[in-house]
Amino acid sequence: EFCQLDLLVDNGWQEAMKDCDFVLHVASPYVSYQPKDENELIKPAVEGTERVLKFAKQSAIKRVVLTSSVVAMLGDANASIDINSNTWTNINAKNVSAYVKSKTMAEKFAWDFVENQDKNHPLELVVINPGPVFGPSISGNLAGASMSMYKDLITGKMPMLPQSSINMSDVRDIAEIHVKALENKQAAGKRFIVTTENPHSFKEMAQILKDKGYSKVSTKVAPNFFLRFMANFSNDIKGMLPFIGFVYNADVSETIKTFDWTPIDLKKTVLDTAKSIDKVLDL
């Protein structure tokens, strides 16, 4: 059964949670550019999380599984770092974007809420921290940031690649861990990273596609000075600048151990994403 709820309005939340034992909170606005007013992202992220937890507590929900992000774990976000369940992003560091602030502040609010709640019928919290999400789409909607970028890549509309690397997350891995997190007793009160352990460059991913016959894919890498120049004309490129040259290794050992998780292979994620887009575009 579907119902429509607003992250900034109380109406309908309690009714939606009636007779439920668990809540998955996966909604939070994302844009690849820096908005003029950072509260466009921060307010719905934090207030939406507050609303979910408040009504979950009132409805005697047993556990909330919250989708956060690895961007809430990046320290000062200006140098290489090893991230784990104990690392947090410093939102006061230089060049921290509104999106990064929104995810970090929303997750911190959630942990504070659970820590300070009335201990009668305590609400349990599990947090999942994915990276950039790829993998096959079940809706056929290519408007999201990851799928839109991927579509441009395989159709030849991305002539040059950013000189950066990412820890990719497969949407199927994320879905699996969310479902397992609902009832796994060992998961309560913990954060779980769901990404590749090591970063992979855009060139590496493009080469996988090229080798599979995607002839329009470019493997040329844009120099950083060129991207900085182009950022004057593109909000999307401007949003990428803080992450150029920034890499991290992710400790996913706790996720593997707790959920008996076998991550989907990078090559499979890359190719299955492309096949999914092929279907939508009828390529």
What role is predicted for each listed range?
Residues 119-121, 135-148, 181-192:
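Glycine/proline-rich active-site loop of Rossmann-fold NAD(P)-dependent oxidoreductases
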Residues 229-262:
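Conserved C-terminal active-site "lid" loop/helix of NAD(P)H-dependent oxidoreductases
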Residues 135, 161-164, 192-199, 210-211, ...:
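Glycine-rich Rossmann NAD(P)(H)-binding loop
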Residues 34, 90-95, 133, 139-140, ...:
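A conserved pocket-lining segment of Rossmann-fold NAD(P)-dependent short-chain dehydrogenase/reductase
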Residues 93-125:
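Active-site Tyr-X1-5-Lys
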Residues 1-47:
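NAD(P)H-binding glycine-rich loop region in Rossmannoid oxidoreductase-like domains
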